[in-house]
Amino acid sequence: MPVRKQDTQRALHLLEEYRSKLSQTEDRQLRSSIERVINIFQSNLFQALIDIQEFYEVTLLDNPKCVDHSKQCEPVQPVTTWEIASLPSTAVTSETLPGSLSPPVEKYRYQDEEVLPPEHISPQVTNEVLGPELVHVSEKNLSEIENVHGFVSHSHISPIKPTEAVPPSSPIVPVTPALPVPAESTVVLPSAPQANPPPVLVNTDSLETPTYVNGTDADYEYEEITLERGNSGLGFSIAGGTDNPHIGDDSSIFITKIITGGAAAQDGRLRVNDCILRVNEADVRDVTHSKAVEALKEAGSIVRLYVKRRKPASEKIMEIKLIKGPKGLGFSIAGGVGNQHIPGDNSIYVTKIIEGGAAHKDGKLQIGDKLLAVNSVCLEEVTHEEAVTALKNTSDFVYLKVAKPTSMYINDGYAPPDITNSSSQSVDNHVSPSSCLGQTPTSPARYSPISKAVLGDDEITREPRKVVLHRGSTGLGFNIVGGEDGEGIFISFILAGGPADLSGELRKGDRIISVNSVDLRAASHEQAAAALKNAGQAVTIVAQYRPEEYSRFEAKIHDLREQMMNSSVSSGSGSLRTSQKRSLYVRALFDYDKTKDSGLPSQGLNFRFGDILHVINASDDEWWQARQVTPDGESDEVGVIPSKRRVEKKERARLKTVKFNSKTRGDKGEIPDDMGSKGLKHVTSNASDSESSYRGQEEYVLSYEPVNQQEVNYTRPVIILGPMKDRVNDDLISEFPDKFGSCVPHTTRPKRDYEVDGRDYHFVTSREQMEKDIQEHKFIEAGQYNNHLYGTSVQSVRAVAEKGKHCILDVSGNAIKRLQIAQLYPISIFIKPKSMENIMEMNKRLTEEQARKTFERAMKLEQEFTEHFTAIVQGDTLEDIYNQVKQIIEEQSGPYIWVPAKEKL
């Protein structure tokens, strides 16, 4: 019985039906096996083999078949050798195509329809069966689709008019080389499609120069997706653009989130990290972020998206035999069902190779390898806990089946970072007998060759060691203490993401012996600070781990601090004088934890940055009485808070040390619990940058800001600053299109043919007029690009606000003050990353260097604009941050809001 493609389609359908019924846990392995069979059925190679078989049995072996029934049938001998060299070929042009393909060939797609019954076949095919004409597809004609060199039968290509919309029911499939056909044979061209072939882009006439993300066109697949806009919009978020690249310097527009229940999620084809090339007929390559957002907003109810995505990396399967040693198997894993290491991928990945372990000694297992099985236990589509259990229950001899990527991860944004991050939601377990395999290590997150979760104090060498650091924008990235009475210089703090942290060679408790051959064993604090300051870019440090000496030093500092705190209370300054009460409302510009302030004269009151406090008694120099003001009203609880004077005095005492970063104001988000005083002068130094400065009494310290309550009759603009702001902005507009919008910017650039004045831009004909308006502060932000001015005007923001929508602004922190001056008080929210690791966890496509720069930019933003922030949010996940932002906007929307008062404290 001949094998036909319809039979394959039917078998595939039955397999998929059966797979959908396997929902029980015990069916997981069977389901996985069936999926492998389905993948084989859907592969291009399998389809090609079916084509060969069908051609051989139906055509070459079918003697009665002939071209013209009026002529005598000539038997066709079985073909055993195909001569490809003798095949005729022509370039694809409108002249070479059959009559049915004669319209201008500008766009191509495969026919993806079932084989039609004879009565539905066109007369041209039934009455005049053409001989096999093979068309050579040149690179020139199809380079935008994919670099194809081969032969494609005419029946596989059909033209589409340039403006014709491809209906959602017609999936796009790729142009692939058809099988070479003998010139002398009669061929009935099959019209049955390939089974679920990978998609290819339609409308390539307007996409002459595709942009690549770390790859060539052959690395990508393309798809056209038609969505119907729902009540909550299209249901996805985007990031990127020429003004704010999402990945490195790539200005492409990326899908960053598929909103559950939205149009995109219900359709099921759009994926996170897809790159949008076009929205309907609007090209969104090399456009600003706002331009892409506008294209999506203006696309109407039926939206055609042309997207590209990276093809899955080919993998090499191999088996590795490991023999457990004292350190176990010696590697860490991450991922699993419900705990994906890579978005959309449930696989188990190797994230760290532990030095000296079995995997390290064997040398075959690498970071980024995917674990498929351990001994006879399958690790595909399992939870993280199941994978850990399988690895834990192995004997001394362990056989690992792994998939190794054949392409280098350096070109892949999904490269698993070499980290062990205890604060990460993605569980990362060490496969070693000494660690609890079901739990995350509790040591601080570190970038280093050997995880600090693996090395105990007894395993760290106590011998002097040489460390070479290269000074970065944050300096050397550590603090020092000591230098009094020859007690030595110790490292007291390692800045996350700084050079010292990234090297992994220095740790808290190290004693610094020398810096660039300058002996610091008997140095004072000032001498050590000067040596570090003047050490240049490359700094050679000889350090020795001395945790016992450092612990004694810490105890001494703690005792001294307690003495000073007690002295402050007993001196009489701790009592509240109530003879001249003064009442006011203030906004807190720092976090306060009453449990960390031992000088409190009575019950204290906790508060966070941005909280509104009603100070009911501000007569005392050191302590005030206050109540918290919530959106629901004023709290009944009265507590004591430090006065403005006390906060500033304590902070200045802490800052009265040698600092190497003249712009650093300390951590303005909170008042640390280790604030010093005169007796602690020069106890801590920060080896952060190049300049030394003593903090005088003029040093600006953030404490409280006086505020008044005001009623507003407009919807407040929203400015979000910090990492992941684009994703949050996009999510707000996508989820609440009726509540959030963007304003139309101004430009002196000439209008293009397809642009509409007032919709795409406000086109300003006079550059002099726009420059004058900028000077008169009519713009909250403006700049120049390609000799054209661009800017966001106060009036544009006001127009959106008066329509009852929050105007989402993608501007700098300077715009906050300008809006306040214009009496448009924005809700300004700063997303404060917890660490470099926190940034990488929320955006796995970032490299360590990109995450470091993002973290540094965030710190600089906080230093410059803290006093202008309405609120500061932190979270372990983007979802957590997004929910906090929504709550803050809801609470701060008005109509009664707190605005800065003109009076001074």
UniProtKB/Swiss-Prot annotation:
Q: Which Pfam families match?
A: Guanylate_kin, L27_1, MAGUK_N_PEST, PDZ, PDZ_assoc, SH3_1
Q: Where in the cell is it found?
A: Cell membrane; Basolateral cell membrane; Endoplasmic reticulum membrane; Postsynaptic density
Give all residue intervals belonging to the Guanylate kinase-like domain: 715-890
Organs and tissues of expression: Expressed in the brain (at protein level). Expressed in the outer limiting membrane and outer plexiform layer in the retina (at protein level). Expressed in epithelial, mesenchymal, neuronal, endothelial and hematopoietic cells during embryogenesis. Expressed in fibroblasts and T-cells. Widely expressed in adult mice.
Q: For this UniProt record, give its keywords in alphabetical order, as a comma-separated list.
A: Cell junction, Cell membrane, Cytoplasm, Endoplasmic reticulum, Membrane, Phosphoprotein, Repeat, SH3 domain, Synapse, Ubl conjugation
Annotated coiled-coil positions are none
Note the SMART domains from the entry: GuKc (SM00072), L27 (SM00569), MAGUK_N_PEST (SM01277), PDZ (SM00228), SH3 (SM00326)
Name its GO BP terms in alphabetical order: actin filament organization; actin filament polymerization; amyloid precursor protein metabolic process; astral microtubule organization; bicellular tight junction assembly; branching involved in ureteric bud morphogenesis; cell population proliferation; cell-cell adhesion
InterPro entries recorded: DLG1-4_PDZ_assoc, DLG1-like, DLG1_PEST_dom, GK/Ca_channel_bsu, Guanylate_kin-like_dom, Guanylate_kinase_CS, L27_1, L27_dom
Q: Which residues carry this modification: Phosphoserine?
A: 122, 138, 158, 232, 568, 573, 575, 579, 598, 619, 685, 688, 835
Q: Which residues form the SH3 domain?
A: 581-651
Question: A cellular component term (GO) from this record?
Answer: plasma membrane
* Span list, region Required for interaction with MARCHF2: 224-546
Q: Name the Gene Ontology molecular function terms of this record.
A: kinase binding; L27 domain binding; molecular adaptor activity; phosphatase binding; potassium channel regulator activity; structural constituent of postsynaptic density; transmembrane transporter binding
UniProt modified residues of type Phosphotyrosine: 399
As for PTM, the annotation reads: Phosphorylated by MAPK12. Phosphorylation of Ser-232 regulates association with GRIN2A.
Region (Disordered) location: 420-449, 663-694
Effect of deleting the gene? Mice have craniofacial abnormalities as well as a cleft palate. They are smaller than heterozygous littermates, unable to feed and die within 24 hours of birth.
Primary subcellular site in the record, as a coarse category: membrane
Lipid bilayer topology: Peripheral membrane protein
Q: Which residues form the PDZ domain?
A: 224-311, 319-406, 466-547
Q: Where is this region: Interaction with SH3 domains?
A: 162-212
Skewed-composition ranges (Polar residues)? 420-445, 683-694
Annotated domain remarks: The PDZ domains may also mediate association to membranes by binding to EPB41 and ADGRA2 together with the L27 domain that binds CASK and DLG2. The L27 domain may regulate DLG1 self-association. The N-terminal alternatively spliced region is capable of binding several SH3 domains and also moderates the level of protein oligomerization.
**What family does the database annotate?**
Belongs to the MAGUK family.
- Protein name according to UniProt: Disks large homolog 1
Q: Which organism is it from?
A: Mus musculus (Mouse)
Q: Which gene encodes it?
A: Dlg1
